[in-house]
Amino acid sequence: MSTGLLDDLCEFYQAKATVICGALGEDIYSRYPFTEKVITLRKQKYSFHWYHLWKKIKGTRWDVLCDLRSTPVTLLVRAKKRIILNKNKKTSQHRVIGLARLNPYSRNTLPRIWLKKEDLNQGKDLLLGHSPPFFVICPSANWEAKVWPEENFTQLSKNIMNSNYFKGGTLIIVGGPGEEEVGKIIMKKLGKINIINLIGLPIIPTAAVFCFSKLYIGNDSGLMHLAASIGTPTIGLFGPTDDNIYAPLGKNTMVVRTPESSEELMSDPDFNHRTSGSLMKSLTINKVEKIAFEMLRKL
């Protein structure tokens, strides 16, 4: 969600950027036109990754240092100006609104993704032989508690693909590496529908596919934010996570959440972050479908 802030920082200070990010963000930030260098941070035992990062950046006196993680290592390097996000300050503000406090223009800038021509061509190649319009679902997430049940995604997909909005079109299933099984289950149950299973595809070609898609529906996940940043009409499904903070932001986005608030779901005495199953079961197919058709009517 910080790509919009990066854009404004580079514009305001007329600067090139060195971006430090995790492996998932490497391909995204390397395509930003003002990126000079990307340093990929990979976690190591005993937090040694911070020491290795310090060695890479300590030799430079930075004009502007922006730290969104409030890491001590950034205090150990030279910088003319420091912009630090205070992560200790609890807030119910959306993440992007929180980042506006660091924005030199004092504005909320929507996240965005930069793609090259060859990226878009790769997206087209992945869709060759399949008929539009394209409807994307992401039935997985990095945490089981925020996963809407597979059978709900299956029935929702069937209903939407049989509607006038997508008749003759293609269902696309996306997700991260290691989440392939749910895609296979949905494909088996929806045998008569044209489906492309792209679960496990790298982030850039996935983003390119989103560019040609009419609608995205998925759990609260990075791919949800990616779709919204691309400009794909996006519906995010929420339960144990707070949509006030993590809702998808873009030109055309909506949220559907469980009747219970995130606080109510997380305060259950039987809740266990590591072992609890889906907390999304109270979110009905009818509710999601209603919002989907409402969005489609406005497109």
Tell where the protein language model's regions lie, with residue ranges:
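Catalytic machinery of carbohydrate-active enzymes
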Residues: 1-299
